[in-house]
Amino acid sequence: MTCGLLSVTVTFRRPAKWTGYLRHLCCRGAVMDLGPMRKSYRGDREAFEETHLTSLDPMKQFASWFDEAVQCPDIGEANAMCVATCTRDGKPSARMLLLKGFGKDGFRFFTNYESRKGKELDSNPFASLVFYWEPLNRQVRVEGPVKKLPEKEAENYFHSRPKSSQIGAVVSRQSSVIPDREYLRKKNEELGQLYQDQEVPKPEYWGGYILYPQVMEFWQGQTNRLHDRIVFRRGLATGDSPLGPMTHHGEEDWVYERLAP
């Protein structure tokens, strides 16, 4: 007997006990309607106004929000971020990484140069970062050019990591195809014994990047979906072009505006 039903829409309204049933439906080609899955954010009295900016330097504003995220007990890794890269012909990719430092010069992270993101940054050295702190209903988006960190800085950070993490970086030629997980286990054990009493050399294919911010957007959620968005961008260094009536001077070469949600 052949069933003529090709697809069905399922509205997700019930709690987690329905997970198994929903998974069953999904495997049968059902279309999962997740529209009702929404939560309340902040109210209008908690809106993020321009007067609430800690600083007109977006790096200082980021530091303020980042500190609140670090202090929030419901946020496990405040430095977790999505890093989006793109090939020269416009094919994007994204993944979660940990931010390992930030300052006036930009945002630092470390990875394998032979990974997909490493190859994309080589051919198209621009990236976007997104930090999402859900318990605070806040998000920060950063855009800008990326360059490799000096080898000495990468070396110093590499050897500050736990030895098991150093060995893991040597074990994994990130994004290469491997036969199975046992392959990693065996190689990890072999290298663990090899470097038991000696320093782990940093692989040439491992290092760091720094993203120099040209755009930084601060987003705070509102229950009525009239979210707050204040975006900073680098202004013209010469100052030849006058600012529009809704564009404001920030610190140094930054200008800022409010965007519609």
From Swiss-Prot:
Pathway(s) per entry: Cofactor metabolism; pyridoxal 5'-phosphate salvage; pyridoxal 5'-phosphate from pyridoxamine 5'-phosphate: step 1/1; Cofactor metabolism; pyridoxal 5'-phosphate salvage; pyridoxal 5'-phosphate from pyridoxine 5'-phosphate: step 1/1
MF (Gene Ontology): FMN binding; protein homodimerization activity; pyridoxal phosphate binding; pyridoxamine phosphate oxidase activity
Binding site for FMN: R95, M96, L97, L98, F110, T111, R116, K117, Q139, Q174, S175, W219, R229
Cofactor(s) essential for the protein: FMN
Keywords, in A-Z order: Flavoprotein, FMN, Oxidoreductase, Phosphoprotein, Pyridoxal phosphate, Pyridoxine biosynthesis
Keyword Oxidoreductase: yes
Signal sequence region: none
Example of a GO cellular component annotation carried by this entry: cytosol
EC number per UniProt: 1.4.3.5
InterPro entries xrefs: Pyridox_Oxase, Pyridox_Oxase_CS, Pyridox_Oxase_N, Pyridoxamine_oxidase_dimer_C, Split_barrel_FMN-bd
Residues where Phosphoserine is found: S241
Biological role stated in the UniProt entry: Catalyzes the oxidation of either pyridoxine 5'-phosphate (PNP) or pyridoxamine 5'-phosphate (PMP) into pyridoxal 5'-phosphate (PLP).
Matching PANTHER family: PYRIDOXINE-5'-PHOSPHATE OXIDASE, PYRIDOXINE-5-PHOSPHATE OXIDASE
UniProt-recorded name of the protein: Pyridoxine-5'-phosphate oxidase
Organism in which the protein naturally occurs: Mus musculus (Mouse)
